[in-house]
Amino acid sequence: MNSKTWENCASAYLQHLKAAGRAKGTIRIHRYYLQVMRGIAPCPGLVSRERLEAWLAGHDWKPETRRSAQGVAHQFFKFLVEDGILKDSPAKFLKPVHVPDGVPHPAPESAVKNALQNAPKRTALMVRFAALCGLRACEICTLQGNAWDGELLRVKGKGGRVRVIPLQDSTLIYSLESCPGWLFPGRIDGHLSAQYTAKLLGSVLPPGVTGHSLRHRFGTVAYRATHDLLAVGAVMGHVKT
């Protein structure tokens, strides 16, 4: 059993992710779960499959969150094995988390119209990017003026993957062309956080409608217009794994 501390192991693992060019948002998520994971045992070397399963079962998480937490555990302990810190991974034989197929809940047009008319200027702009471009909160908050090349908007999505989106909305085009830096400046690496962006979006939408519902609205409208599921999926940044 190796007695290296959580701090030592987590620091080495996060450096490993950074060296591999993983997105800042991805590293932030991994750091969060590693912090939560520290309650499993005094050090990573004392974590067993049973303790790991008890930790996962002890949280009232949604399936997507549970899968994310388990994924971090898999990658973290695999790294410790590869680095010679552990002989075997306690996450090796965890059963995969079942995540039911998601059902789209597009925002009603009335909700979109009301938000665009009544929301503060900054939040209304966020609504436009979500409803008209299908951007996630984590993509909206990191937008910069130079992401627009005059024809296409380049968006860095999940896992640092870049996709291009055609823009026709004059308000969005003007906002990008008149912005030399971050479109939504803040305290997280110079821009707003995804969590705060999602909160702002939710604040101008009716109960039961979220910022992600605006993204679903975009997907629904785009599919109705094209009937091309692959093209819509590419614009929205859906990735097959």
Which role does the model predict for each range below?
Residues 11-103:
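N-terminal core-binding DNA-recognition domain of tyrosine recombinases/integrases
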Residues 86, 98-101, 105-137, 141, ...:
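Basic, Lys/Arg- and aromatic-enriched nucleic-acid-binding interface segment
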Residues 129-130, 143, 221-225, 235:
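Short alpha-helical segment immediately N-terminal to, or the first helix within
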Residues 133, 142-175:
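Conserved tyrosine-mediated DNA breakage-rejoining catalytic core shared by Y-recombinases
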Residues 147-150, 208, 227-241:
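Short, polar N-cap/turn motifs at the start of nucleic acid-interacting alpha helices
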Residues 168-208, 212:
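Active-site/catalytic core of tyrosine-dependent DNA strand-transfer enzymes
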Residues 207-226, 239:
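Short basic/aromatic active-site micro-motif
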